[in-house]
From Swiss-Prot:
It comes from Haloquadratum walsbyi (strain DSM 16854 / JCM 12705 / C23). Keywords: Cytoplasm, Hydrolase, NAD, One-carbon metabolism. This is Adenosylhomocysteinase. Substrate binds at residues 137, 162, 192, 196. GO terms for cellular component: cytosol. The lineage of its organism: Archaea, Methanobacteriati, Methanobacteriota, Stenosarchaea group, Halobacteria. May play a key role in the regulation of the intracellular concentration of adenosylhomocysteine. Its cofactor is NAD(+).
Length: 432
């Protein structure tokens, strides 16, 4: 077992922390969010009765906050032993992590504000539990297992990946024939991407930016880098708050889609001369660079809602700056030689999770995403022989199962196909 300690042990060693009150506050947050997560509530009832995950060990690298914690406890209720750490050094809520670590079937290593060495030590600590299932947000755990612990690959049933960046990494790994066990691309299934990516990212990113800066969007030029599902959500929600939205893209069809939906579309360096607020949503690196910083207006706000802290090139910005200082909690100002100040939120990390005031996506949308995660884990265990190594789409029947639970919870009834309609749709012989 790794020498890296679970959070409870770390807090016990800190005489300035009241561990019990910290756990109580974390539990209070978890209970509040669970009230607004009817899918997880229903799955808790099912998993508690059938114990579909009995005997399995689940290793997780996720954003450890209240909504994620309810997924963790659902998996534990289903019979699994769960070890978890963070997938971002700044996104963990320590009170929630402490509450999780008090569950006898859960070990949490997640702690906010760790350095790079401790971040990867915590991942190693989770891997030391020898998981049979992995759940990732960004693919760091899958990578660590393949790179440093290939001896575990034969005993891993499969995994699930939460986010766009992680799925991109997994597909690249799969194309190189390096991925050695099946992983569900949870990010790509409709019940995740149409809600979590659009409404979750759009609402939480803009809300966090507004609360962190205490500024309005009305009348401002908001530049959205990337027009995938996350970028669409940010653009849509910003326009709804009376911002003028400018989109930058590298993919011609997405650029055309943004144009046809009424947004201005232009290269980043042109948008840089006009933007008041910049939000990156690409999952790629060097989206905003030195040539863009050089033409931005004084007071520009820069935030990342994509994934890793490489979308805004902070190394180049630091080289341009003659001074840097904390302008406000969660806001780092970079003063340039000509007196302009460019303001970076949350150190360029995921603003909706890493900013000091951040709470992540709304509970209702994460309920759907985490419902998919839970049924994917169940599917891997129940039908393990059906999946070869590689990236797999979430089976449609699982996506529909979660949608049906949500509709029932919302009190929404829908029609069903008649037998005649089903036969018509399945037939190829009907013409005009």
């Amino acid at each position: 077992m790794s020498a890296y300690s679970p959070l409870s042990a770390q807090l016990d060693a800190d005489t300035d922390v009241d561990v019990e009150s910290t756990r109580t506050e974390g539990r209070r947050k978890m209970e509040w969010t669970l009230q607004h997560m009817p899918i997880l509530q229903e799955l808790r009832a099912r998993f508690a009765e059938t114990k579909p995950l009995a005997g399995e060990t689940i290793g997780m690298a996720m954003h450890v906050e209240a909504k994620t914690a309810n997924l963790v406890e659902l998996l534990a209720l289903g019979g699994a032993e769960v070890a978890i750490t963070g997938c971002n050094p700044l996104s963990t809520h320590d009170d929630v992590s402490a509450a999780l670590d008090s569950n006898e079937n859960v070990t949490s290593y997640a702690k906010r504000g760790v350095d790079e060495e401790a971040y990867y030590d915590a991942i190693e600590a989770v891997v030391a539990h020898e998981p049979t299932i992995t759940i990732d947000d960004g693919m760091d755990m899958v990578y660590a297992i393949h790179e440093d612990h290939p001896d575990l690959l034969d005993t891993i049933i499969g995994g699930a990946e939460e986010t766009t960046t992680g799925v991109h990494r997994l597909r690249a790994m799969d194309e190189d024939d390096e991925l050695q066990y099946p992983v569900f691309a949870v990010n790509d299934t409709p019940m995740k991407r149409l809600f979590d990516n659009v409404h979750g990212t759009g609402e939480s990113a803009l809300a966090t930016i507004a609360m962190t800066t205490n500024l309005s969007y009305a009348g401002k030029n908001v530049v959205v880098a990337g027009y995938g599902y996350c970028g669409k959500g940010v653009a849509q929600k910003a326009a709804g708050q009376n911002a003028n939205v400018i989109v930058t893209e590298v993919e011609p069809r997405r650029a055309l889609e943004a144009h046809m939906e009424g947004y201005e579309v232009m290269p980043m360096n042109e948008a840089a001369t006009r933007g008041d607020v910049f939000v990156t949503t690409t999952g790629n690196r060097d989206v905003i660079t030195q040539e863009d910083f050089e033409v931005m207006s004084d007071g520009a706000i820069l935030a990342n809602a994509g994934h890793f802290d490489v979308e805004i090139n902070l190394e180049e910005l630091s080289e341009l700056a003659i001074d840097t200082y904390e302008a406000r909690d969660g806001v780092q100002a970079y003063e340039l030689a000509d007196g302009r100040r460019l303001n970076v939120l949350a150190e360029g990390r995921l603003v909706n999770l890493a900013a000091p005031i951040a709470l992540g996506h709304p509970a209702e949308v994460m309920d759907q995403s985490f419902g998919i995660q839970a049924v994917c884990v169940r599917e891997l265990i129940e039908n393990k022989s059906s999946y070869d190594a590689g990236v797999h789409n979430v089976p449609d029947e699982l996506d529909r199962e979660v949608a049906e639970i949500k509709l029932e919870a919302e009190g929404v009834d829908i029609d069903s196909l008649t037998q005649t309609q089903s036969e018509y749709l399945d037939s190829w012989s009907h013409g005009t």
